[in-house]
């Protein structure tokens, strides 16, 4: 894991397996099925790092040989909240890692001015819960900012929120950091820039279209 000095709340997960799989996702000839599988696999690998600092306690268990005080995750419960629609493809990988997590949804679409328009919010109970927001792309950053806003407006502490994406543009990361400097953002790659259509370069195209086999 590495950081960029420009963005103190950004964490880039540069594990070789993540980078290898991301390269295949970038390939325009990768099939919808393979794209979907790779997204799930990368998210699972990223989830390992994202959950690294969950608090631990112990409980007494009986092995076939003896009783022992063994480590278990303590305290806060987890919720996975994909930003629709492309974020759905990431939730399965996180659920593979933490199958007991609750799942919420935040639905936004990008208007002509690239600003997010909210059309759905469904969340589990908020008390004493860590929320993992997920969306494959942080391009302009506005949708990511909006998703965090949704939780903060409901009094979820910043310390209980993380955002995870595959690729991000520096422009979007700056927008996110300006709005939420107290929320950690995890990505697999910080790409070069946004083009005139607000697409990440080099990026991987429209993640939702490639995930679901649709055309914009």
Swiss-Prot record:
Note on how the cofactor is bound: Binds 1 Mg(2+) ion per subunit. The magnesium is bound as Mg-PRPP.
Keyword Nucleotide-binding set for record: yes
Gene Ontology terms: biological process: UMP salvage; uracil salvage
Regulation: Allosterically activated by GTP.
Pfam family, one: UPRTase
Cofactor: Mg(2+)
SUPFAM superfamilies reported in the protein's UniProt record: PRTase-like
E.C. no: 2.4.2.9
Name of protein: Uracil phosphoribosyltransferase
